[in-house]
Every structure is written in structure tokens, then in C-alpha cells.
Swiss-Prot record:
Its main location: membrane. Keywords: Cell junction, Cell membrane, Gap junction, Hearing, Membrane, Transmembrane, Transmembrane helix. A connexon is composed of a hexamer of connexins. Interacts with CNST. The gene is GJB6. The chain crosses the membrane at residues 23-45, 76-98, 132-154, 193-215. One of its GO terms (cellular component) is actin filament. Residues 46-75, 155-192 are extracellular. It comes from Bos taurus. One gap junction consists of a cluster of closely packed pairs of transmembrane channels, the connexons, through which materials of low MW diffuse from one cell to a neighboring cell. Residues 1-22, 99-131, 216-261 are cytoplasmic. Gene3D superfamilies: Gap junction channel protein cysteine-rich domain. This is Gap junction beta-6 protein. It is found in: Cell membrane; Cell junction, Gap junction.
Length: 261
């Protein structure tokens, strides 16, 4: 899957998202995918070739590089973006199933009054409610879990988010404790912090969207409960009308009894 296909796929699901979800997609592709494709690959393109150690012992440089960088930053970022975008597949499958069922009912004549034709069903925006609400919130929850998990993996693999200028390596077959040097460590540290910051922003947006959906459901249920407790409008008007009729009737009887016979 290339990045264009991923953009088309997630962008299609974005039609049915909330406003916060649309902001999340923008941050994902502008500040993460574009940076990864345009700039980060250029910065990390020479990572293994320019990793130098002050020894000529065969195999020492490769072993030290594998020890300090077991997984390439770019490959781990790409894997993170794929995992974070994958939960949108749940929403896409749910929407596709909803449209398939709507089209089937339309052909049977059950929803002729709701849709003009089959194209109208495809253009309709599916509201986030009912079973789709559970699917959508589940996808957001998995996004948050994946973001947090990959941030921890980054910190665990590289002992933090800062790339040092000099690395001390004493692993076999190195003859002793040797110094190893990374190409452009400051530039790579800046990119690492930027990508981690973008990941934090995306995770906060996911948390905000999840809270928004939960509060929206709570407000909707509270409003529904108040509506069920309150008397209907026509019954309230009828009771008020009966009270007015009783008052008028009592006033008329009092006026009649007040005259002498």
C-alpha cells in the first residue's frame, strides 16, 4: 500500500467523521506522512553508511549499529502510521455494510420515500449513532492505544528521543570500548522530536474526539429522559383548558346565585 492509497482510503472514511476527526486526518497527512515522505527519508537515507566507529575490526561497526538502532526510525514511523490508520478500516466496513443493506431495501421498495436512487444512498452521510457509534469509538480507542504503544517502543528502543553525538560500544567482535558516530545527530533529533510531537497531538485529538462522542451520547440520553418525564403538550393544554372551563363555570354559577329570585 502506497501513501496515496492510504490517503484515499482514510479520506473516504473522513466524510463520516466529526470535526475533530477531520482535523486529525489533516494533522496525520500534512505533519506526519508528508514530512516522512519528503524530508525524513532524506535525513535518514545515509544512516548506516555514515555510521562510523574508530576501529577497523571487521564486523564491529555493523554489530554496534544493530545494537543502537535495531529498527530504522523511518520504518518504525511507517509502521506506526499504518497501524494508526488501520482502525479506520472498521468504520469503512461498517459504512459499506450499511449502504449495502440500504441498497437492498431500496430495491425491494422499502425505502423509496427516503432515497431517490442508488446514487443518493452512496452520497448520503451516515450519522454516527447506534451500532456505528460503537464501531467509531472502538476505532478511536485503538488509535490511542497504538499511538501510546509506539511512543513507548521508540523510547525503549533508542533510550529516549535524543540522538547523542558519540556512542560507546564494547560488543563483540569489537576489540575494546570504541567510539561510534552518527551522521547529522542534531538534525535527526529535531525530526524525531517533531514526529513524536505530532504523534502526541494526534493522540490528544483522538482523546478529545472520544470525550466529545461520550458527552454527546450522555446529553442525548439526558434530553430523552427529560422528554419522557415531561407531559405531552396536548395533554398539558387540555388540562389548562379544563381548569379554565371550571373557573368560568364556577364564576357563572356564583353570578346567577347572587341575583334575587
Amino acid at each position: 500500500m502506497d501513501w496515496g492509497t492510504l490517503h484515499t482510503f482514510v479520506g473516504g472514511v473522513n466524510k463520516h467523521s466529526t470535526s475533530i476527526g477531520k482535523v486529525w486526518v489533516t494533522v496525520l497527512f500534512v505533519f506526519r506522512v508528508m514530512i516522512l515522505v519528503v524530508a525524513a527519508q532524506e535525513v535518514w537515507g545515509d544512516e548506516q553508511e555514515d555510521f562510523v566507529c574508530n576501529t577497523l575490526q571487521p564486523g564491529c561497526r555493523n554489530v554496534c549499529y544493530d545494537h543502537f538502532f535495531p529498527v530504522s526510525h523511518i520504518r518504525l514511523w511507517a509502521l506506526q502510521l499504518i497501524f494508526v490508520s488501520t482502525p479506520a478500516l472498521l468504520v469503512a466496513m461498517h459504512v459499506a455494510y450499511y449502504r449495502h443493506e440500504a441498497a437492498r431495501r431500496f430495491r425491494r421498495g422499502e425505502t423509496r420515500s427516503e432515497f431517490k436512487d442508488l446514487e443518493d444512498i452512496k452520497r448520503q452521510k451516515v450519522r454516527i449513532e447506534g451500532s456505528l457509534w460503537w464501531t467509531y469509538t472502538s476505532s478511536i480507542f485503538f488509535r490511542i492505544v497504538f499511538e501510546a504503544a509506539f511512543m513507548y517502543v521508540f523510547y525503549f528502543l533508542y533510550n529516549g528521543y535524543h540522538l547523542p553525538w558519540v556512542l560507546k560500544c564494547g560488543i563483540q567482535p569489537c576489540p575494546n570500548l570504541v567510539d561510534c558516530f552518527i551522521s547529522r545527530p542534531t538534525e535527526k533529533t529535531v525530526f524525531t522530536i517533531f514526529m513524536i510531537s505530532a504523534s502526541v497531538i494526534c493522540m490528544l485529538l483522538n482523546v478529545a474526539e472520544l470525550c466529545y462522542l461520550l458527552l454527546k451520547v450522555c446529553f442525548r440520553r439526558s434530553k430523552r429522559a427529560q422528554t419522557q418525564k415531561a407531559p405531552p403538550n396536548h395533554a398539558l393544554k387540555e388540562s389548562k383548558q379544563n381548569e379554565m372551563n371550571e373557573l368560568i363555570s364556577e364564576g357563572g354559577q356564583n353570578a346567577i346565585t347572587g341575583f334575587p329570585s
